[in-house]
């Protein structure tokens, strides 16, 4: 009992202790002992969720939101992890818990990378693959586990490339990942293309508009104020840009390597994800296979 006097002091110190970081939601991969703790602007990356099906080898690419859920499009490198293409799968994830709440596959051979997604409202999901675009009835696809019989599609050629996708509230957009400045552009499309050209091929002359974007762009999202956020990355670095509606860069921030697609949810919150730390990219110096909310006010 001689140390009983210490109990109130210890209780007081415990109350003043710095709170631990919030746990990462979702399913932690079995192969990853730790993640990179110090990533650029890490203080702005909140509500972290493990990207889906990491143990199965899926590489996350596209990201969009609908109500209480996020949707992630991924591909499974095939025949092995050296491949940059493979079967595509779309996962639905509960924002609050990080739990996978269903998934569906894109028919084999029709999608190989699933670079970007955008939710267009009324149950319609827009998915961009390198040379194909899909308009998917989400409820039907989730119910059957496949988008077969639940989608329309068009092939794209010429300057059109489905490296990523977004939605401005009226029209879907697609953009090109490239290291060549003249080719670094986003294109605004009309949803009616899926009615007029379902199963056919279109090129850039069918785009309603195009604007320039930064090099090596991986994702894009319009916020409620009309800003266009664009992500760019490779295995060594990541960038987050804020552009105006005409494509002029207004701000740039360092971000986690492997930063892929972006989305803005119904509450106006900006989200992103990184493909670093997936089985395919374990040789990268960064391991951060998370979906995360980005707080613009904390970016430096």
Model regions: which residues?
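Surface loop/turn motifs at the tips and blade-to-blade linkers of beta-strand repeat domains
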Residues: 51-55, 104-110, 153-158, 208-214, ...
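Conserved beta-propeller blade signature
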Residues: 70-72, 124-127, 172-175, 228-230, ...
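A short helix->beta-strand "capping" segment at the edge of beta-propeller domains
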Residues: 31-56, 203-205
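Structural motif
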Residues: 81-89, 132-138, 181-190, 236-241, ...
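Residue-level detector of Asp-centered blade-edge/turn motifs that repeat once per structural unit
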Residues: 65-67, 119-122, 167-169, 222-225, ...
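Repeated scaffold domains used in trafficking and secretory/extracellular systems
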Residues: 57-62, 111-116, 157-167, 214-219, ...
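Loop/turn-rich, solvent-exposed surfaces of beta-rich toroidal or solenoidal domains
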Residues: 207-243
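Beta-strand-rich domains and repeat architectures in extracellular enzymes and scaffolds
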Residues: 48-86
């Amino acid at each position: 009992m001689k140390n009983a006097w210490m109990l109130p002091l210890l209780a007081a110190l415990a109350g003043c202790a710095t709170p631990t970081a919030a746990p990462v939601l979702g399913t932690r991969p079995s192969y990853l002992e730790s993640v990179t703790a110090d990533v650029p602007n890490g203080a702005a990356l909140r509500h972290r969720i493990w990207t889906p099906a990491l143990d199965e080898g899926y590489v996350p690419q596209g990201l969009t939101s609908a109500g209480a859920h996020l949707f992630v499009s991924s591909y499974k490198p095939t025949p092995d992890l050296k491949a940059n293409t493979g079967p595509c799968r779309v996962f639905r994830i509960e924002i609050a818990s990080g739990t996978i709440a269903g998934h569906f596959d894109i028919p084999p051979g029709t999608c190989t990378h699933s670079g970007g997604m955008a939710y267009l409202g009324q149950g319609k999901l827009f998915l961009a693959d390198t040379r194909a675009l899909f308009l998917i009835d989400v409820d039907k696809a989730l119910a059957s586990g496949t988008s077969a019989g639940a989608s329309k599609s068009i092939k794209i050629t010429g300057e059109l490339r489905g490296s990523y996708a977004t939605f401005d509230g009226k029209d879907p957009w697609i953009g090109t990942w490239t290291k060549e400045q003249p080719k670094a552009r986003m294109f605004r499309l009309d949803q009616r293309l899926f009615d007029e050209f379902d199963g056919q091929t279109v090129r850039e002359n069918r785009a309603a508009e195009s604007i320039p974007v930064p090099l090596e762009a991986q994702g894009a999202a319009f916020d409620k104020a009309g800003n266009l956020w664009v992500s760019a990355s490779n295995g060594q670095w990541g960038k987050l840009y804020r552009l105006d509606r005409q494509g002029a860069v207004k701000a740039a921030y360092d971000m986690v390597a492997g930063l892929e697609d972006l989305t803005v949810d119904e509450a106006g919150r900006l989200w992103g994800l990184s493909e670093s730390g997936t089985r395919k990219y374990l040789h990268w110096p960064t391991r951060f296979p998370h979906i995360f909310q980005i707080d613009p006010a904390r970016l430096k």
